[in-house]
Design a protein with these regions (language model features):
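Small-residue hotspots
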Residues: 25-30, 44, 51-52
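Structured C-terminal subdomain patch of bacterial secreted/periplasmic proteins
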Residues: 238-258
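Hydrophobic membrane-insertion alpha-helices, especially the h-region
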Residues: 46-61
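Membrane-interface helix-boundary motifs at transmembrane edges
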Residues: 33-43
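Hydrophobic alpha-helical segments of integral membrane proteins
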Residues: 3-11, 63, 67-71, 249-256
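Membrane-embedded alpha-helical segments of integral membrane proteins
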Residues: 1-33
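A structural signal for short, hydrophobic/glycine-enriched beta-strand patches
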Residues: 57, 61-236
Length: 258
């Protein structure tokens, strides 16, 4: 019985949409291959098979981890002592998205990614007594009338009983605007050296943008792409694996284009 239960994570993954769907496609391609006898008719099957295999790989957490280590510059974690030693003046949290239809809160709340960033910033702020800034408006895909992310973050801090934001930048729509508008806000108060909080995979491009805006930046990364799954599960497709490879590829392209 225990042996069967130990297979539960694998069996569950196999029937989930990402893995189960790709296995079904592979099965149909094998069937089509055996039904087809002409070479020219098999070429589309070969192409579809290669594409499906690549999608399988890009949906694996093992591949996401490998890509994050080889495509993106690596950033090391920091602690409170590091920020004090480097004379950081403020902690800046990069927005990570809002869930506008959070019915359990009767209004908007931070996305899980944004909340993770905010929680880490709270930890650093409490350890260093440094003031916090949050940067995030209504993204390009947002709609008029929505609450800005910085305002939602301020509400979240109140719910958590955490220190209030010293600065709210609520007009930016992307990382470039995050940097430009936050830099203007902080410089008016004499702040030039910040600890920047965002996910590790998002950090290299973010640091580049904030330094271009004239701030001295100490990266304070969190949310590294890692996995505590067994090696077998890391090589089975999952929605999380596909999402993580998407993050890495997007950031890699962003670094190439900026």
């Amino acid at each position: 019985m225990d042996t069967l239960l130990s297979l539960k994570p694998i069996l569950t993954t196999l029937v989930m949409p990402a893995c189960g769907g790709l296995l079904a496609v592979f099965a149909m391609l094998v069937w089509a291959w055996h039904r087809s006898t002409r070479t020219y008719a098999r070429m589309p099957i070969v192409f579809a098979g290669i594409t499906t295999f690549l999608l399988w790989l890009l949906s694996c957490q093992a591949v996401a981890i490998w890509l994050s280590l080889h495509l993106l510059p690596q950033v090391s974690p920091v602690g409170a002592d590091d920020l004090k030693r480097q004379h950081v003046q403020a902690i800046v949290v990069l927005g990570g998205g809002v869930e506008n239809e959070a019915i359990e809160y009767s209004g908007p709340t931070l996305s899980p990614d944004a909340m993770s960033r905010l929680l880490y910033a709270i930890h650093l702020s409490r350890s260093t007594q440094l003031p916090m800034a949050y940067t995030g408006g209504i993204g390009w895909a947002g709609q008029n009338g929505q609450t800005s992310e910085a305002e939602v973050a301020a509400i979240a801090l109140t719910r958590l009983g955490a220190p209030a934001l010293r600065w709210q930048e609520n007009q930016s729509r992307d990382t470039r605007e995050n940097a430009l508008l936050t830099a203007a806000l902080l410089k008016s108060d004499g702040i030039t050296h910040i600890a920047l909080v965002t996910h590790a995979w998002h950090m290299p491009r973010s640091v580049r943008q904030f330094e271009a805006a004239g701030l001295q930046v100490t990266p304070a990364p969190m949310g590294y792409i890692r996995s505590d799954l067994s090696p077998l599960l890391q090589w089975l497709p999952s929605g999380k694996g596909l999402r993580e490879t998407g993050w890495v590829i997007r950031e890699w392209l962003g670094l190439l284009l900026t």
